[in-house]
Amino acid sequence: MGPWRVIRVGGQLVRRSAVFLMGLAAMIQLGPAAAMAASMLISLLIYAVAFGLKYAAGFILLLFFHELGHLFASRVVGLRTSAPIFLPFIGAVISLKQLPNNAKTEANIAIGGPAMGTLSALVCLVFYFWTDSLLMLVLAYTACLLNLFNLIPCDPLDGGRIAAAVSPHMWWVGSLVTGVLFFYTYNFIILLIFAVSLLRLWRSEKWDDNSTYYRLSLRQRLRVLWWYLGLLTVLGIATLYIADLLR
C-alpha cells in the first residue's frame, strides 16, 4: 500500500470515526426510540457513502429485523430489552434489562435473531424471483452470510450463546473458526471477536462456579441443538444456492 493510499484510508477512517462519535454523543441525550432512530440514520448515511443508498437501506433493514427477532424472543421468555442501537461497520445491538435465569433462556433469545435473519433472507429471495431485482438477490446473499457468521459458536456472537446451552465446550470450535477466518481475511472486527472468544475461554473455569446456569436436561439441550443445526442447514443451502445464481 503506497503512502498516499495510507493517507487517504486514514482520512476516511478519521472522518467515519468523527461522525460515529458525534452521533454517539448526541444519542446519550436522547430517549430509547430517538436513540435508535438517530443511530439508524447515522449508519444509513455512512453505509450509503460506502455502498450506495439502496443497498444501505436494505442492509439497515436486515440488521433491524435481526434485532427485532431478539426483541420478540426476549418478550416471549418474559425479559425486557433496550431498543436496538446501530453501530456503523459493526452491526446493531440490544441489551437485556434483566439477566436470563439459565443458558436455555439465553439461547432462546439468541436464536431469535438468526431465525428472523433467515426469514429475511428468504423474503429477499422471494422478492428477487418476483421482481428479478439484482439488489434483492444481493441482499438475500448478504443476510445469509451475516447470519451464518453470527452462528459461529463463540462469544460474543449469537452462536456462542446458543452453543452454551448445548455445551460450553463448543466455544473452542468457534474460537478456532474465527481464528482461521481472521488469517484468511485480516479483518479487524473478526480479530476483535477472536480476542473476546479467547478471553471467554480463559475465564472458562467459572463454569463450575456457576454450574446451575448450564445445568439443563438432555431434552432442553437437544431442542436448542435442533434449532441451531436447522438454522445452519437452511442458511448453508440458501447461501450456496444464491451464490450459484450470482455467478
Where does each model-flagged region fall?
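Hydrophobic transmembrane alpha-helices and their immediate loop junctions
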Residues: 1-247
